[in-house]
Amino acid sequence: MRYMLLIHQGDTPTPGSEAWDRLSEDEQRAVYAAYGSINQTAGVTPGVRMEPPELATTVRVEDGRTLTTDGPFVAVKEALGGYLFLEADDLDAAIELASRIPAARMGGGIEIRPIVGS
């Protein structure tokens, strides 16, 4: 079964943020190592880390006109910060991997979505 794991940042410290700067160098290295390990896990297709939602542009088409708005589509506390794809035997395996993602234990959450037709 294929899953998409959506990494919602919440209060997770991310590189470049004040919260990240408050982490010790050992804590920062541990976060990078955890993501590196996850990306090397069999069945994982790594995604990418995204810029903060304030840098988003939302596009809508109304009456044939393209409208753009600076910022995310909706204001949410746990903005989408990244994603990855996983080929796993079952949901339990996806949950196990999600529990290893640093954001899950540092103030964020991981949403697991099955891929249609997988």
Sequence positions of predicted segments:
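Conserved, structured core segments of small domains
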Residues: 1-118
